[in-house]
Amino acid sequence: MAGHSKWANIKHRKERQDAKRGKIFTKWIRELTVAARQGGGDPGSNPRLRLALDKALGANMSRDIIDRAVARGAGATEADNVEELTYEGYGPGGVAVMVECMTDNRNRTAAAVRHAFSKCGGNLGTDGSVAYLFERKGQISFAPGVDEDALTEAALEADADDVVSHEDGSIDVFTSFTSFYAVRNALEAAGFKGDDAEIVMQPTTSAELDLEGAEKVLKLIDMLEDLDDVQNVYSNADIPEDVAAQLG
């Protein structure tokens, strides 16, 4: 939607904050361990592990740390009892929020997530309370400068769902969850390697916010992202560009 920043600004803020806090290493160590536990330690036959490996290397994580995390998950060493959990709720302004976590203590994590929602004027919901407002999608992002026509043609030939161009010249290719890795591989074979690629929860509806609402929602997202057990936070917040320009 022209004139709106929607979810991209929140994602980019999150990446900067993760890097600033050093949390990104912990995030990818957990993802590597869980991915290896679920699908084995060979990235050639485990697409989730391959994606986590690419992300970890992109974050300048050492190969030694990566190998230890994979070995722990694959069973070569004693693994931590880490499980994946997703919490759902509503934030200020009726914004739907999904919080993906990895934790070795679900009671601790649930209490921390509930506290964040309560403190910021939101409500932690039950399973399914907002999940129906999101779709699990693949997202492959390209920096400004890529040939839009050629990329669009290659993406459609690879059976991508949608190609979205932004005012700054960047482009996102969206895929179904099941075809993400196939589309990514096809684009790379055609000469288009994305600057970022990930599985996301894409909202199917949006909640437009004014300045006050945006500030409150971003406070909630910041508080959730500060929690050690939180991996990803998704919302259907729609922040118009004129409002985003007023945010600190």
Curated annotation (Swiss-Prot):
Record organism: Pseudomonas fluorescens (strain Pf0-1)
Compartments reported by the entry: Cytoplasm
Cellular component, GO, one term: cytosol
Main location: cytoplasm
One GO term (biological process): regulation of DNA-templated transcription
GO molecular function: DNA binding
Keywords of the record: Cytoplasm, DNA-binding, Transcription, Transcription regulation
PANTHER family from the UniProt entry: TRANSCRIPTIONAL REGULATORY PROTEIN YEBC-RELATED, TRANSLATIONAL ACTIVATOR OF CYTOCHROME C OXIDASE 1
Source taxonomy: Bacteria, Pseudomonadati, Pseudomonadota, Gammaproteobacteria, Pseudomonadales
Sequence similarity: Belongs to the TACO1 family.
Superkingdom of this protein's organism: Bacteria
Disulfide-bond pairs as recorded: none
Listed name of the protein: Probable transcriptional regulatory protein Pfl01_4410
